Regions:
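Generic structural marker for isolated residues within well-ordered, non-membrane alpha-helices
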Residues: 41, 57, 174
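M16 family metallopeptidases and their MPP-like homologs
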Residues: 20-32, 57-167, 183-192
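His/Glu-based metal-binding/catalytic segments typifying zinc-dependent metallopeptidases
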Residues: 1-53
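Generic recognition of flexible, low-complexity loop/linker segments
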Residues: 11-12, 73-75, 162, 174-178
Length: 196
């Protein structure tokens, strides 16, 4: 589908008697998996919240102990420039304001100060290891072959992406994050028993 910008909203949904609350946010990005800065955005997203060693996980769950789970994901457009960047947190309803503040603070810090060379190197290494391990799984291979047939692609593109990830610089990762992640454009949904 053609790119359509996310309408920024904040919606609260009451879920009576549920022990946990959930925050889900997201925004569309005018980017495909063929964009020159897609590899850099993969690295940037992983550092922000795409793994258990990410900043969000380390701070919101680890250091502050505010959530049971927290992170981000990147769903890349394969047919057109229409990707999605999302974030989530699972937490006790009474921690709503603290969780929102902590997530916002990590996003602001990443955008303002950027990432370090060490963070970028670690993220690249982890991404490449995960991609290599995934290709050793029969189910991943089968799914990739079906996807490649549909998209008219070959394994050569996967190799190209591996090489592009390996060559991402700290400047490129920071530039991609700042280009695509606009906190004011996020659509945010909060579900939980907040009335208690």
């Amino acid at each position: 589908d053609p790119f359509r910008a996310t309408q920024p909203v904040v919606r609260t949904i009451e879920t009576p008697d549920k022990a946990n609350a959930v925050l889900v946010g997201g925004m569309t990005l005018p980017m495909s998996d063929r964009a020159p800065d897609y590899p850099a955005m993969l690295v940037a997203e992983r550092i922000l919240g795409g793994a258990t060693e990410s900043r969000m996980f380390a701070v919101v769950r680890g250091k502050l102990g505010l959530s049971y789970g927290v992170g981000t994901w990147l769903d890349e457009g394969r047919l057109d420039d229409n990707s999605t960047l999302g974030l989530y947190a699972i937490y006790a309803p009474e921690n709503l304001d603290k969780v929102r503040a902590a997530v916002s603070a990590e996003i602001a810090l990443a955008l303002e100060k950027g990432y370090t060379g060490e963070e970028v190197d670690n993220a690249k290494r982890a991404l490449l290891e995960e991609r290599k391990s995934a290709r050793a799984e029969d189910s991943t291979l089968a799914g990739s072959l079906v996807s490649q047939a549909f998209l008219g692609r070959t394994w050569a593109l996967s190799g190209d992406l591996d090489r592009a990830i390996a060559s991402v610089t700290v400047e490129q990762a920071n530039a991609a994050l700042r280009k695509y992640l606009k906190p004011a454009d996020l659509a945010t949904f909060l579900a939980g028993d907040f009335a208690k």
